[in-house]
UniProtKB/Swiss-Prot annotation:
Gene ablation phenotype (knockout): Cells lacking this gene show a complete loss of toluene-4-monooxygenase activity.
Record keywords, A-Z: Aromatic hydrocarbons catabolism, Iron, Metal-binding, Monooxygenase, NAD, Oxidoreductase
Binding-site list for Fe cation 2: 134, 197, 231, 234
Family in the record: Belongs to the TmoA/XamoA family.
Function: Component of the toluene-4-monooxygenase multicomponent enzyme system which catalyzes the O2- and NADH-dependent hydroxylation of toluene to form p-cresol. Also able to convert benzene to phenol, catechol, and 1,2,3-trihydroxybenzene by successive hydroxylations.
SUPFAM superfamilies documented for this protein: Ferritin-like (SSF47240)
Activity vs pH: Optimum pH is 6.8.
Position of the signal peptide: none
This protein's name: Toluene-4-monooxygenase system, hydroxylase component subunit alpha
CDD domains per the UniProt record, alphabetical: AAMH_A (cd01057)
GO biological process: toluene catabolic process
Catalytic reaction annotation: toluene + NADH + O2 + H(+) = 4-methylphenol + NAD(+) + H2O
Length: 500
Protein backbone atom coordinates (compact mmCIF):
# COMPACT_ATOMS: atom_id res chain seq x y z
CA UNK A 1 0.00 0.00 0.00
CA UNK A 2 1.43 3.35 -1.03
CA UNK A 3 2.35 5.80 1.73
CA UNK A 4 0.88 9.23 1.13
CA UNK A 5 3.09 12.17 2.08
CA UNK A 6 2.11 13.98 5.28
CA UNK A 7 1.12 17.16 3.47
CA UNK A 8 -1.64 15.28 1.62
CA UNK A 9 -3.56 14.22 4.72
CA UNK A 10 -2.45 16.12 7.81
CA UNK A 11 -4.77 19.12 7.54
CA UNK A 12 -7.74 16.84 6.99
CA UNK A 13 -7.02 14.76 10.09
CA UNK A 14 -6.33 17.68 12.43
CA UNK A 15 -9.36 19.71 11.31
CA UNK A 16 -12.00 16.97 11.15
CA UNK A 17 -15.10 18.20 12.97
CA UNK A 18 -18.25 16.11 13.13
CA UNK A 19 -21.58 17.85 12.69
CA UNK A 20 -23.83 16.43 15.44
CA UNK A 21 -27.17 14.97 14.38
CA UNK A 22 -28.32 12.73 17.26
CA UNK A 23 -27.71 15.46 19.85
CA UNK A 24 -27.58 19.23 19.72
CA UNK A 25 -24.32 21.14 19.49
CA UNK A 26 -24.86 22.42 23.03
CA UNK A 27 -25.35 18.88 24.33
CA UNK A 28 -22.13 17.78 22.65
CA UNK A 29 -20.20 20.80 23.91
CA UNK A 30 -21.98 22.13 27.02
CA UNK A 31 -20.84 25.63 27.92
CA UNK A 32 -19.95 24.62 31.47
CA UNK A 33 -17.39 22.09 30.23
CA UNK A 34 -16.45 23.65 26.90
CA UNK A 35 -16.27 27.38 27.66
CA UNK A 36 -17.05 28.26 24.04
CA UNK A 37 -18.86 31.48 25.10
CA UNK A 38 -21.55 31.01 22.47
CA UNK A 39 -19.12 31.05 19.54
CA UNK A 40 -20.47 28.61 16.90
CA UNK A 41 -18.69 25.42 15.85
CA UNK A 42 -17.62 26.67 12.41
CA UNK A 43 -15.76 29.61 13.96
CA UNK A 44 -13.71 27.27 16.13
CA UNK A 45 -12.55 25.41 13.01
CA UNK A 46 -10.24 28.36 12.28
CA UNK A 47 -8.19 27.48 15.39
CA UNK A 48 -4.63 27.01 14.11
CA UNK A 49 -2.02 25.67 16.51
CA UNK A 50 1.57 26.67 15.61
CA UNK A 51 3.18 23.34 16.59
CA UNK A 52 1.81 20.42 14.59
CA UNK A 53 2.50 16.71 14.84
CA UNK A 54 0.93 13.41 13.83
CA UNK A 55 0.53 10.28 15.93
CA UNK A 56 3.25 8.25 14.13
CA UNK A 57 5.68 11.16 14.54
CA UNK A 58 4.70 11.62 18.17
CA UNK A 59 5.25 7.95 19.07
CA UNK A 60 8.62 7.83 17.32
CA UNK A 61 9.93 10.97 19.03
CA UNK A 62 8.61 10.04 22.47
CA UNK A 63 10.18 6.58 22.25
CA UNK A 64 13.56 8.19 21.60
CA UNK A 65 13.14 10.69 24.44
CA UNK A 66 12.12 8.02 26.94
CA UNK A 67 15.03 5.82 25.92
CA UNK A 68 17.39 8.76 26.41
CA UNK A 69 16.02 9.77 29.82
CA UNK A 70 16.03 6.27 31.29
CA UNK A 71 19.40 5.28 29.81
CA UNK A 72 21.12 8.38 31.22
CA UNK A 73 19.60 7.60 34.63
CA UNK A 74 20.85 4.02 34.44
CA UNK A 75 24.31 5.11 33.32
CA UNK A 76 24.69 7.61 36.17
CA UNK A 77 23.23 5.53 39.01
CA UNK A 78 26.74 4.96 40.39
CA UNK A 79 27.63 8.66 40.29
CA UNK A 80 26.43 9.08 43.89
CA UNK A 81 24.56 12.31 43.17
CA UNK A 82 22.86 12.20 46.57
CA UNK A 83 26.11 11.70 48.49
CA UNK A 84 28.19 14.19 46.49
CA UNK A 85 25.76 17.07 45.97
CA UNK A 86 25.40 20.15 48.14
CA UNK A 87 22.49 19.76 50.61
CA UNK A 88 20.90 22.86 49.08
CA UNK A 89 20.70 21.12 45.72
CA UNK A 90 19.19 18.00 47.30
CA UNK A 91 16.51 20.26 48.82
CA UNK A 92 15.83 21.64 45.35
CA UNK A 93 15.12 18.12 44.11
CA UNK A 94 12.82 17.34 47.03
CA UNK A 95 10.78 20.53 46.72
CA UNK A 96 10.47 20.12 42.93
CA UNK A 97 9.34 16.50 42.97
CA UNK A 98 6.85 17.05 45.78
CA UNK A 99 5.33 20.17 44.22
CA UNK A 100 5.17 18.96 40.62
CA UNK A 101 5.13 15.16 40.16
CA UNK A 102 1.56 14.27 41.16
CA UNK A 103 0.36 17.65 39.87
CA UNK A 104 1.14 16.33 36.39
CA UNK A 105 -1.85 14.00 36.75
CA UNK A 106 -4.08 17.04 37.25
CA UNK A 107 -2.64 18.32 33.99
CA UNK A 108 -3.69 15.02 32.36
CA UNK A 109 -7.25 15.89 33.41
CA UNK A 110 -6.94 19.38 31.95
CA UNK A 111 -5.61 18.12 28.63
CA UNK A 112 -8.35 15.48 28.61
CA UNK A 113 -10.98 18.16 29.13
CA UNK A 114 -9.70 20.04 26.08
CA UNK A 115 -9.47 16.80 24.07
CA UNK A 116 -13.14 16.06 24.75
CA UNK A 117 -14.91 19.39 25.18
CA UNK A 118 -13.05 21.99 23.10
CA UNK A 119 -15.03 22.99 20.04
CA UNK A 120 -11.77 23.52 18.12
CA UNK A 121 -10.70 20.31 16.34
CA UNK A 122 -7.06 21.43 16.29
CA UNK A 123 -7.20 21.97 20.04
CA UNK A 124 -8.71 18.52 20.60
CA UNK A 125 -6.03 16.93 18.45
CA UNK A 126 -3.12 18.61 20.24
CA UNK A 127 -4.63 18.05 23.68
CA UNK A 128 -4.69 14.31 23.00
CA UNK A 129 -0.92 14.42 22.66
CA UNK A 130 -0.71 16.78 25.64
CA UNK A 131 -2.62 14.26 27.75
CA UNK A 132 -0.03 11.60 26.96
CA UNK A 133 2.76 14.10 27.63
CA UNK A 134 1.52 14.86 31.12
CA UNK A 135 1.05 11.19 31.95
CA UNK A 136 4.67 10.64 30.92
CA UNK A 137 5.83 13.56 33.08
CA UNK A 138 4.05 12.23 36.14
CA UNK A 139 5.53 8.76 35.70
CA UNK A 140 9.06 10.08 35.13
CA UNK A 141 9.01 12.40 38.12
CA UNK A 142 7.75 9.68 40.44
CA UNK A 143 10.18 7.04 39.19
CA UNK A 144 13.35 9.15 39.29
CA UNK A 145 13.19 10.14 42.99
CA UNK A 146 12.09 6.67 44.09
CA UNK A 147 15.65 5.34 44.30
CA UNK A 148 16.46 8.01 46.91
CA UNK A 149 13.66 6.95 49.30
CA UNK A 150 15.89 4.32 50.91
CA UNK A 151 18.42 7.06 51.70
CA UNK A 152 16.12 9.91 52.70
CA UNK A 153 12.45 9.66 53.73
CA UNK A 154 11.72 13.18 52.48
CA UNK A 155 11.91 11.91 48.89
CA UNK A 156 8.79 9.84 49.59
CA UNK A 157 6.94 13.16 49.52
CA UNK A 158 7.24 13.15 45.73
CA UNK A 159 4.16 10.91 46.00
CA UNK A 160 2.79 11.86 49.41
CA UNK A 161 2.70 15.67 49.16
CA UNK A 162 -0.52 15.85 47.15
CA UNK A 163 -2.09 13.24 49.41
CA UNK A 164 -1.42 15.35 52.49
CA UNK A 165 -2.59 18.57 54.13
CA UNK A 166 0.90 20.09 54.23
CA UNK A 167 0.63 23.86 53.66
CA UNK A 168 2.75 24.05 50.47
CA UNK A 169 0.88 21.08 49.03
CA UNK A 170 -2.42 22.83 49.83
CA UNK A 171 -1.14 25.92 47.98
CA UNK A 172 -0.16 23.86 44.93
CA UNK A 173 -3.41 21.86 44.90
CA UNK A 174 -5.51 25.01 45.30
CA UNK A 175 -3.76 26.57 42.32
CA UNK A 176 -3.98 23.54 40.04
CA UNK A 177 -7.59 22.84 41.00
CA UNK A 178 -8.34 26.45 40.10
CA UNK A 179 -6.71 26.59 36.66
CA UNK A 180 -7.15 22.94 35.63
CA UNK A 181 -9.67 20.63 37.27
CA UNK A 182 -12.14 23.37 38.16
CA UNK A 183 -12.28 25.06 34.75
CA UNK A 184 -13.80 24.53 31.31
CA UNK A 185 -11.74 23.49 28.27
CA UNK A 186 -11.03 26.97 26.89
CA UNK A 187 -10.19 28.33 30.34
CA UNK A 188 -7.70 25.47 30.74
CA UNK A 189 -6.14 26.35 27.38
CA UNK A 190 -5.70 29.97 28.50
CA UNK A 191 -4.93 29.61 32.20
CA UNK A 192 -2.82 26.44 32.10
CA UNK A 193 -1.09 26.31 28.73
CA UNK A 194 -0.70 30.04 27.98
CA UNK A 195 -0.44 31.72 31.37
CA UNK A 196 1.33 28.99 33.35
CA UNK A 197 3.17 26.70 30.93
CA UNK A 198 4.17 29.15 28.21
CA UNK A 199 4.69 31.95 30.69
CA UNK A 200 6.43 30.19 33.56
CA UNK A 201 7.20 26.46 33.54
CA UNK A 202 8.49 26.20 29.98
CA UNK A 203 11.19 28.78 30.71
CA UNK A 204 11.72 27.60 34.27
CA UNK A 205 12.55 24.10 33.10
CA UNK A 206 15.24 25.52 30.82
CA UNK A 207 16.81 27.37 33.74
CA UNK A 208 16.42 24.40 36.08
CA UNK A 209 18.13 22.08 33.60
CA UNK A 210 21.04 24.52 33.31
CA UNK A 211 21.36 24.78 37.11
CA UNK A 212 21.27 20.99 37.41
CA UNK A 213 24.09 20.65 34.91
CA UNK A 214 26.12 23.28 36.78
CA UNK A 215 25.55 21.33 40.01
CA UNK A 216 26.74 18.13 38.31
CA UNK A 217 23.33 16.43 38.44
CA UNK A 218 23.12 15.35 34.81
CA UNK A 219 20.37 12.83 35.53
CA UNK A 220 18.00 15.60 36.64
CA UNK A 221 19.23 17.96 33.90
CA UNK A 222 18.44 15.36 31.25
CA UNK A 223 15.05 14.57 32.82
CA UNK A 224 13.96 18.21 32.93
CA UNK A 225 15.18 18.87 29.38
CA UNK A 226 13.20 15.87 28.15
CA UNK A 227 10.05 17.16 29.85
CA UNK A 228 10.60 20.70 28.57
CA UNK A 229 10.54 19.57 24.94
CA UNK A 230 7.01 18.25 25.54
CA UNK A 231 5.99 21.44 27.34
CA UNK A 232 7.16 23.65 24.49
CA UNK A 233 4.76 21.83 22.14
CA UNK A 234 1.54 21.44 24.11
CA UNK A 235 1.94 24.86 25.77
CA UNK A 236 1.10 26.39 22.38
CA UNK A 237 -2.61 25.58 22.68
CA UNK A 238 -3.59 28.71 24.57
CA UNK A 239 -2.41 31.33 22.08
CA UNK A 240 -4.76 30.31 19.22
CA UNK A 241 -7.66 30.04 21.68
CA UNK A 242 -7.04 33.60 22.87
CA UNK A 243 -6.78 34.83 19.29
CA UNK A 244 -10.09 33.20 18.38
CA UNK A 245 -11.87 34.72 21.40
CA UNK A 246 -10.56 38.17 20.56
CA UNK A 247 -11.63 37.86 16.91
CA UNK A 248 -15.14 36.94 18.06
CA UNK A 249 -15.70 39.84 20.45
CA UNK A 250 -14.58 38.15 23.68
CA UNK A 251 -11.46 40.22 24.35
CA UNK A 252 -12.54 41.36 27.82
CA UNK A 253 -13.24 37.79 28.95
CA UNK A 254 -9.91 36.61 27.54
CA UNK A 255 -8.01 39.43 29.25
CA UNK A 256 -9.55 38.62 32.63
CA UNK A 257 -8.62 34.94 32.45
CA UNK A 258 -5.03 35.83 31.55
CA UNK A 259 -4.77 38.40 34.34
CA UNK A 260 -6.10 36.00 36.97
CA UNK A 261 -3.89 33.08 35.93
CA UNK A 262 -0.64 35.03 35.60
CA UNK A 263 -0.95 36.39 39.13
CA UNK A 264 -1.91 33.05 40.63
CA UNK A 265 1.00 31.35 38.86
CA UNK A 266 3.40 34.09 39.94
CA UNK A 267 2.75 33.72 43.67
CA UNK A 268 3.36 29.95 43.59
CA UNK A 269 6.35 30.39 41.28
CA UNK A 270 7.89 32.92 43.68
CA UNK A 271 7.77 30.62 46.70
CA UNK A 272 9.00 27.50 44.86
CA UNK A 273 11.53 28.87 42.35
CA UNK A 274 12.81 32.13 43.85
CA UNK A 275 14.46 30.57 46.94
CA UNK A 276 15.91 27.74 44.82
CA UNK A 277 17.72 30.12 42.48
CA UNK A 278 18.89 32.71 45.03
CA UNK A 279 19.43 30.64 48.20
CA UNK A 280 19.43 26.85 47.70
CA UNK A 281 21.66 26.59 44.62
CA UNK A 282 25.35 26.66 45.66
CA UNK A 283 26.89 30.06 45.00
CA UNK A 284 29.45 28.73 42.54
CA UNK A 285 26.71 27.06 40.48
CA UNK A 286 24.41 30.09 40.10
CA UNK A 287 24.28 31.31 36.51
CA UNK A 288 21.99 34.26 37.26
CA UNK A 289 19.72 35.63 39.97
CA UNK A 290 16.00 34.94 40.11
CA UNK A 291 15.34 38.58 39.16
CA UNK A 292 17.67 38.37 36.16
CA UNK A 293 16.00 35.13 35.09
CA UNK A 294 12.53 36.68 35.38
CA UNK A 295 13.45 39.71 33.29
CA UNK A 296 15.36 37.78 30.65
CA UNK A 297 12.97 34.88 30.15
CA UNK A 298 9.55 35.67 31.62
CA UNK A 299 8.81 39.40 31.51
CA UNK A 300 9.91 40.00 27.93
CA UNK A 301 8.14 36.90 26.68
CA UNK A 302 4.86 37.82 28.36
CA UNK A 303 4.98 41.36 27.01
CA UNK A 304 5.67 40.17 23.46
CA UNK A 305 3.01 37.45 23.59
CA UNK A 306 0.31 39.77 24.94
CA UNK A 307 1.09 42.52 22.44
CA UNK A 308 1.15 40.06 19.53
CA UNK A 309 -2.30 38.79 20.53
CA UNK A 310 -3.74 42.27 20.96
CA UNK A 311 -4.10 42.04 24.74
CA UNK A 312 -2.93 44.50 27.37
CA UNK A 313 -0.43 43.86 30.11
CA UNK A 314 -2.31 42.97 33.31
CA UNK A 315 -3.51 46.02 35.25
CA UNK A 316 -1.21 45.10 38.14
CA UNK A 317 1.96 44.93 36.00
CA UNK A 318 3.85 47.53 38.08
CA UNK A 319 3.03 45.62 41.28
CA UNK A 320 4.26 42.45 39.59
CA UNK A 321 7.60 44.03 38.66
CA UNK A 322 8.02 45.34 42.22
CA UNK A 323 7.26 41.87 43.56
CA UNK A 324 10.11 40.39 41.52
CA UNK A 325 12.56 42.46 43.56
CA UNK A 326 11.10 41.59 46.94
CA UNK A 327 8.58 38.80 47.34
CA UNK A 328 10.72 35.67 47.18
CA UNK A 329 13.21 36.98 49.77
CA UNK A 330 10.40 37.27 52.31
CA UNK A 331 8.89 33.94 51.26
CA UNK A 332 12.29 32.30 51.68
CA UNK A 333 12.73 33.69 55.18
CA UNK A 334 9.27 32.44 56.13
CA UNK A 335 9.82 28.95 54.71
CA UNK A 336 13.19 28.71 56.46
CA UNK A 337 11.73 29.84 59.79
CA UNK A 338 8.78 27.41 59.54
CA UNK A 339 11.09 24.75 58.07
CA UNK A 340 9.64 21.96 60.25
CA UNK A 341 6.43 22.27 58.20
CA UNK A 342 8.23 21.60 54.88
CA UNK A 343 9.02 18.22 53.32
CA UNK A 344 12.46 19.49 52.29
CA UNK A 345 15.36 21.10 54.18
CA UNK A 346 15.51 24.82 53.35
CA UNK A 347 19.03 26.19 52.89
CA UNK A 348 19.57 29.55 54.60
CA UNK A 349 21.94 30.75 51.87
CA UNK A 350 23.32 33.65 53.93
CA UNK A 351 27.05 33.11 54.38
CA UNK A 352 29.07 36.36 54.05
CA UNK A 353 29.87 35.51 50.41
CA UNK A 354 26.25 34.74 49.63
CA UNK A 355 25.10 37.95 51.30
CA UNK A 356 27.56 39.93 49.18
CA UNK A 357 26.09 38.26 46.10
CA UNK A 358 22.54 39.06 47.22
CA UNK A 359 23.45 42.69 47.88
CA UNK A 360 25.00 42.95 44.43
CA UNK A 361 21.96 41.45 42.71
CA UNK A 362 19.40 43.21 44.94
CA UNK A 363 20.83 46.53 46.19
CA UNK A 364 19.51 47.22 49.68
CA UNK A 365 19.11 43.55 50.58
CA UNK A 366 21.32 43.89 53.68
CA UNK A 367 19.31 46.83 55.04
CA UNK A 368 16.10 44.89 54.73
CA UNK A 369 16.26 41.09 54.89
CA UNK A 370 19.88 41.18 56.04
CA UNK A 371 18.86 42.79 59.33
CA UNK A 372 16.56 39.89 60.10
CA UNK A 373 19.25 37.37 59.22
CA UNK A 374 21.64 39.24 61.54
CA UNK A 375 19.28 38.55 64.44
CA UNK A 376 18.78 34.93 63.37
CA UNK A 377 22.53 34.40 63.02
CA UNK A 378 23.23 35.91 66.44
CA UNK A 379 20.62 33.66 68.04
CA UNK A 380 22.09 30.57 66.35
CA UNK A 381 25.64 31.46 67.42
CA UNK A 382 24.45 31.95 71.00
CA UNK A 383 22.55 28.66 70.98
CA UNK A 384 19.18 30.38 71.38
CA UNK A 385 17.52 27.86 69.05
CA UNK A 386 14.09 28.43 70.57
CA UNK A 387 14.16 31.87 68.95
CA UNK A 388 14.76 30.52 65.44
CA UNK A 389 11.98 27.94 65.51
CA UNK A 390 8.20 28.52 65.36
CA UNK A 391 5.70 27.85 68.12
CA UNK A 392 2.53 28.52 66.14
CA UNK A 393 1.30 29.07 62.57
CA UNK A 394 1.58 32.25 60.45
CA UNK A 395 -1.27 34.19 58.85
CA UNK A 396 -2.04 32.70 55.45
CA UNK A 397 -3.53 34.27 52.29
CA UNK A 398 -7.00 32.98 51.37
CA UNK A 399 -6.03 32.99 47.69
CA UNK A 400 -2.40 31.86 47.32
CA UNK A 401 -2.54 29.73 50.52
CA UNK A 402 0.96 31.08 51.25
CA UNK A 403 1.83 33.06 54.42
CA UNK A 404 1.36 36.82 54.34
CA UNK A 405 4.72 38.58 54.05
CA UNK A 406 6.16 42.05 53.63
CA UNK A 407 9.51 43.82 53.34
CA UNK A 408 11.36 44.09 56.69
CA UNK A 409 13.67 46.86 57.85
CA UNK A 410 13.13 50.56 57.15
CA UNK A 411 10.91 49.69 54.18
CA UNK A 412 8.49 47.65 56.29
CA UNK A 413 5.30 47.39 54.23
CA UNK A 414 3.22 44.49 55.52
CA UNK A 415 -0.42 45.01 54.66
CA UNK A 416 -3.42 42.72 54.91
CA UNK A 417 -6.16 43.08 52.32
CA UNK A 418 -9.43 41.85 53.80
CA UNK A 419 -12.86 41.20 52.35
CA UNK A 420 -16.16 40.26 53.98
CA UNK A 421 -18.21 37.95 51.78
CA UNK A 422 -21.41 36.16 52.78
CA UNK A 423 -20.68 36.76 56.45
CA UNK A 424 -17.14 35.38 56.34
CA UNK A 425 -13.98 37.49 56.63
CA UNK A 426 -11.20 36.62 54.17
CA UNK A 427 -7.60 37.87 54.33
CA UNK A 428 -5.32 38.26 51.32
CA UNK A 429 -1.63 38.93 50.85
CA UNK A 430 -2.10 41.55 48.14
CA UNK A 431 -4.63 43.74 46.40
CA UNK A 432 -4.44 41.43 43.38
CA UNK A 433 -5.16 38.27 45.38
CA UNK A 434 -8.32 39.94 46.69
CA UNK A 435 -9.25 41.06 43.16
CA UNK A 436 -8.91 37.48 41.86
CA UNK A 437 -11.31 36.29 44.56
CA UNK A 438 -13.83 38.99 43.62
CA UNK A 439 -13.86 37.90 39.98
CA UNK A 440 -15.22 34.45 40.82
CA UNK A 441 -16.15 34.20 44.52
CA UNK A 442 -18.17 30.99 44.04
CA UNK A 443 -14.96 29.30 42.88
CA UNK A 444 -13.10 30.15 46.09
CA UNK A 445 -15.53 30.97 48.91
CA UNK A 446 -15.80 27.54 50.56
CA UNK A 447 -12.10 26.76 50.74
CA UNK A 448 -10.36 26.86 54.13
CA UNK A 449 -6.64 27.51 54.35
CA UNK A 450 -4.48 25.78 56.94
CA UNK A 451 -5.04 28.50 59.57
CA UNK A 452 -8.81 28.53 58.96
CA UNK A 453 -8.81 24.80 59.68
CA UNK A 454 -6.73 25.35 62.81
CA UNK A 455 -9.14 27.98 64.14
CA UNK A 456 -12.16 25.82 63.22
CA UNK A 457 -10.86 23.06 65.48
CA UNK A 458 -10.10 20.63 62.67
CA UNK A 459 -6.49 20.34 63.88
CA UNK A 460 -6.12 18.60 67.23
CA UNK A 461 -4.37 19.19 69.49
CA UNK A 462 -4.23 22.91 68.63
CA UNK A 463 -0.45 23.05 68.83
CA UNK A 464 2.40 23.03 66.34
CA UNK A 465 2.77 19.30 66.99
CA UNK A 466 -0.90 18.80 66.20
CA UNK A 467 -0.52 20.82 63.01
CA UNK A 468 2.48 18.75 61.90
CA UNK A 469 0.51 15.55 62.45
CA UNK A 470 -2.44 17.01 60.50
CA UNK A 471 -0.07 17.90 57.65
CA UNK A 472 0.92 14.26 57.34
CA UNK A 473 4.40 14.08 58.84
CA UNK A 474 4.99 10.60 60.22
CA UNK A 475 8.41 11.05 61.79
CA UNK A 476 10.92 13.73 62.69
CA UNK A 477 13.13 12.56 59.78
CA UNK A 478 10.51 13.84 57.34
CA UNK A 479 10.24 17.32 58.84
CA UNK A 480 12.36 20.07 57.38
CA UNK A 481 15.51 21.29 59.08
CA UNK A 482 18.31 23.65 58.11
CA UNK A 483 19.92 22.08 55.05
CA UNK A 484 23.48 22.64 56.29
CA UNK A 485 22.80 22.07 60.02
CA UNK A 486 23.59 25.76 60.67
CA UNK A 487 27.19 25.42 59.45
CA UNK A 488 26.69 28.73 57.63
CA UNK A 489 26.39 30.54 60.97
CA UNK A 490 29.99 29.68 61.90
CA UNK A 491 31.15 31.33 58.68
CA UNK A 492 29.41 34.50 59.84
CA UNK A 493 31.28 34.72 63.16
CA UNK A 494 34.12 37.01 61.95
CA UNK A 495 31.65 39.39 60.30
CA UNK A 496 29.44 39.47 63.40
CA UNK A 497 32.42 40.22 65.67
CA UNK A 498 33.58 42.99 63.34
CA UNK A 499 30.07 44.47 63.29
CA UNK A 500 29.87 44.35 67.10
Amino acid sequence: MAMHPRKDWYELTRATNWTPSYVTEEQLFPERMSGHMGIPLEKWESYDEPYKTSYPEYVSIQREKDAGAYSVKAALERAKIYENSDPGWISTLKSHYGAIAVGEYAAVTGEGRMARFSKAPGNRNMATFGMMDELRHGQLQLFFPHEYCKKDRQFDWAWRAYHSNEWAAIAAKHFFDDIITGRDAISVAIMLTFSFETGFTNMQFLGLAADAAEAGDYTFANLISSIQTDESRHAQQGGPALQLLIENGKREEAQKKVDMAIWRAWRLFAVLTGPVMDYYTPLEDRSQSFKEFMYEWIIGQFERSLIDLGLDKPWYWDLFLKDIDELHHSYHMGVWYWRTTAWWNPAAGVTPEERDWLEEKYPGWNKRWGRCWDVITENVLNDRMDLVSPETLPSVCNMSQIPLVGVPGDDWNIEVFSLEHNGRLYHFGSEVDRWVFQQDPVQYQNHMNIVDRFLAGQIQPMTLEGALKYMGFQSIEEMGKDAHDFAWADKCKPAMKKSA
